[in-house]
Amino acid sequence: ALKSLRKVQHLIRKMQAKLTALCTDADLLKAIHPTAAVSGLPQQQAKKALAEIETFDRRWYAGTLGVMSQHLSEFCVTIRSAFIEENQVRVFAGAGIVEGSQPVEEWLEIERKAAGLISLFAENNGE
């Protein structure tokens, strides 16, 4: 499905499964995190490269947020997030870099994604 937001569009895929007694919610979460969308493939090499290249702590960005109960678990990937400390807000957003990606276009995509979050913190909600 296509989800249109104010600044960007996303392809969305919902997944649902009934777990067997041999697989717990935590097992499934561990198996799918981090998603290739935020860490890259092949996963081990991509994670190593990110650790070497990125000079900042991702905080909640690209993490997993959700609820787990006896009867239901639901999670999402935090593909946009903000960290507020004292009078400073750090906004996190990213782009899917693949073979053939154009750096300028990817950077503009990141700026569009971040703009939605930034507008929430603007003094007049849109400055």
Language model regions located:
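Contiguous alpha-helical scaffold segments within structured protein domains
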Residues: 1-51, 122-125
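Glycine-rich, small/acidic residue-mixed loop/short-helix segments
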Residues: 36-45, 49-127
